[in-house]
Amino acid sequence: MNGVYIRVLVLQSPSETFIRIQHEPVGREEGLTTEQLKAIRFTPQFAAKEVEGILGPELTTAMEFCDWSTRNIAVPDEVFKNLHTFLNDTQMVEATGTTGFYSFVSRFTVGLDVDGKANNTVPIPE
């Protein structure tokens, strides 16, 4: 799910460094590659299918869900059902809650400039 956290941050605040720096190492520990991290960061919203070869079907579907939830709030039934093929009911609640919560967190940390780095450039994954 770390890919989802990072994607919310990309959509909410492209310059947000605090949380992204916190989550990139965790994403790597969970198996995300540099190429996947770059795809999550640089793929335009609603274009997850373009990087499915990099992300794989599950992460692509999660990214599509995240894009809809973060940018449109209402998630189309088809997008919800697609993610539900990979996640059980409890995990769907967690994915929806995580996406919404991280929308709040990104606004909170940027608004308060929690670590004094709100204006810093976010490093590109290496």
Regions found by a protein language model. Give the residues of each.
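Hydrophobic alpha-helical segments
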Residues: 1-126
